Amino acid sequence: YKTGLGAELTVGNLASMSSGMEWSEKYYSIINITTESYFTDDLRSLILNQKIINKPGQKFRYSSGDTQLLGMVIEKATNTNLSDYLKNNFTIPMGFENEALWQLDSEESGIEKAYCCFASNAKDFARFGKLYKNNGKWNNEILLDSTFINKAINPVYEDSPYYGYGWWLYTFEDKKVFTMNGHRGQFVIVFPEEGIIIVRLGDKNKEGDNDDGDLYKYISEGYNLATSIE
């Protein structure tokens, strides 16, 4: 974006989902930008045609489009695709036991769906939680700057104290908790001060369950289980 409100857009706005992009986050509507993003074979063009309609950096508004544009910015800045960037800078240094899979929009376009569809196993997902718990360090190697980590796991805006940079923020019995929330009940849950990391993979417990309701069950049960076996 070279002109208009988009010219004010920063990487931090994208990471905190406050870009002001024209985007409606509806998953089950046939005619909707989010639905289209899952089925298009040219995700790059779809995102670049979205307008910035509100002043960036004002408030949090959940938007898969923000995350996708952020992924495209990283791709442009590093001159490599997201899969290779993640592999070379994170999964290999962190010793992933299995190769992760990332869904593309199409073989021809070859762009990763940055907002979703990254598949791995519980143990390897937990490594991301550990990286953030350790302020970006892995075996004394700095993979992420600690200043960025601090911003990621703390609220960006007062009126949305539940979101930082890509992480959801909670408290449990006065303990700080930050989580990665995936589709249909997949979570990475981190208690940074207690050093507890919980990963839950799978589908929702039953039709009609609320993601947040399920999450609080996993936080409570996981914490109680972890502390009972110490």
Question: Where does each model-flagged region fall?
Answer:
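A short acidic/small-residue loop/turn micro-motif
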Residues: K204-K206
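Residue-level detector of functionally pivotal "anchor" positions at catalytic/ligand-binding pockets or at interdomain
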Residues: T227-E230
